[in-house]
Amino acid sequence: MTTNLLDFDLEGLAAFCEQLGQKRFRATQLFRWIHQKGASDFEQMTDLAKSLREKLAVSAHIQGLNVVSRHESADGTIKWLFDVGAGDVIETVFIPETDRGTLCISSQAGCAVGCRFCSTGHQGFSRNLTTGEIISQLWFAEHFLRKHLGRNERVISNVVMMGMGEPLQNYSQLLPALKVMLNDHGYGLSRRRVTVSTSGVVPMIDRLAKDCPVALAVSLHAPQDALRSNLVPLNKKYPIAELLEACTRYQSAAPRDFITFEYCMLDGVNDQPEHARQLVALMKTHAANGLSCKFNLIPFNPFPASGLLRSDMPQVMAFAKILMDAGIITTVRKTRGDDIDAACGQLAGDVQDRTSVDQRMAAQRQGMLGGIKVVVVNGDTA
């Protein structure tokens, strides 16, 4: 059996090349061919010696995932279904904007967290994806889109680990994939443009801060433990206080000076004025310990098994106003891709909004945001 080179970060690929009797710099050449040029045939790699190409041909391969289907939304959003074997499929979503392209990547086939408002969680958990299966989504999408859009430059500028699965419950495979995304010989993405979204796996938030601090988004969805435990069962193990303490620790290492909290707006469940006021009190308590945050309010995308309904827009905007009046940066999601079931919650999380807010965050810390209006956004980190 040969080795799939998509399973390696650069360090792993260098070790593999050494096993073939090659110097480590050959791994950099090989890495560039795979990730920057999208090569899958060693004979394309003309700056590698023929003897090395022959060794690679008998010991390795470059194999992405098989595409089951591709769906394109009226708004330009593209969703792919990939076959990962044993009857499992995963979903990957590309969200185009005028100044950026965001890819939402899955980390697991299914999800074990079981959030009430997420259709993937209702499907149950099958297995973790390998590093190669995670990075294959980016590898395929980037090079497909270059051809599809007729572009010779990078199309995907931002990656969000917000597709199917809880990324931090697949940490050993996630970490090398993140390193490939960030490596200048791979995709060269900045840490600010790669976001890991988590439902709150506290020990792994601390590990990510140490190993590979990228932008962090946390699925909060409630201001107090009883309600959050009902919506996000993982809260029973890692309650809100522990989660926010971990977020404060993470912030000291993070590439951005704030943590994004995702909040799915559920009619009559977590969208009342008292919930907003409880959030304000909660954030003020932790701000005293150094936590800076941004809230992203997400209109719920209903599905039959949930038994939940979407908050109407006036209720969402009233909720946002309470947060904003308290000086908390707040955005409201504009749904994308819902006509192809690619919107938030129809996979396993947030796929769109990581808007650039550096100046407003600085103003928030100075308590200057009382009169700023709520912004409806649909982009990714600039």
From Swiss-Prot:
It is an enzyme of class 2 (transferase). CDD domains: Radical_SAM. Residues 97-339 form the Radical SAM core domain. PROSITE patterns: RADICAL_SAM (PS51918). InterPro entries: Aldolase_TIM, Methyltransferase_A, RlmN_N, RNA_MTrfase_RlmN, rRNA_lsu_MTrfase_RlmN/Cfr, rSAM. Binds 1 [4Fe-4S] cluster. The cluster is coordinated with 3 cysteines and an exchangeable S-adenosyl-L-methionine. Disulfide bonds join C104-C344. Its EC number is 2.1.1.192. It is found in: Cytoplasm. Its cofactor is [4Fe-4S] cluster. It comes from the Bacteria. [4Fe-4S] cluster binds at C111, C115, C118. It catalyses: adenosine(2503) in 23S rRNA + 2 reduced [2Fe-2S]-[ferredoxin] + 2 S-adenosyl-L-methionine = 2-methyladenosine(2503) in 23S rRNA + 5'-deoxyadenosine + L-methionine + 2 oxidized [2Fe-2S]-[ferredoxin] + S-adenosyl-L-homocysteine; adenosine(37) in tRNA + 2 reduced [2Fe-2S]-[ferredoxin] + 2 S-adenosyl-L-methionine = 2-methyladenosine(37) in tRNA + 5'-deoxyadenosine + L-methionine + 2 oxidized [2Fe-2S]-[ferredoxin] + S-adenosyl-L-homocysteine. The active site is at E91, C344. Gene3D superfamilies: 1.10.150.530, Aldolase class I. Keywords: 4Fe-4S, Cytoplasm, Disulfide bond, Iron, Iron-sulfur, Metal-binding, Methyltransferase, rRNA processing, S-adenosyl-L-methionine, Transferase, tRNA processing. Coiled coil: none annotated. GO terms for biological process: rRNA base methylation; tRNA methylation. S-adenosyl-L-methionine binds at G165, E166, S197, S219, L220, H221, N301. HAMAP family: RNA_methyltr_RlmN. Specifically methylates position 2 of adenine 2503 in 23S rRNA and position 2 of adenine 37 in tRNAs. m2A2503 modification seems to play a crucial role in the proofreading step occurring at the peptidyl transferase center and thus would serve to optimize ribosomal fidelity. Reaction proceeds by a ping-pong mechanism involving intermediate methylation of a conserved cysteine residue. This is Dual-specificity RNA methyltransferase RlmN. It comes from Polaromonas naphthalenivorans (strain CJ2). The lineage of its organism: Bacteria, Pseudomonadati, Pseudomonadota, Betaproteobacteria, Burkholderiales.
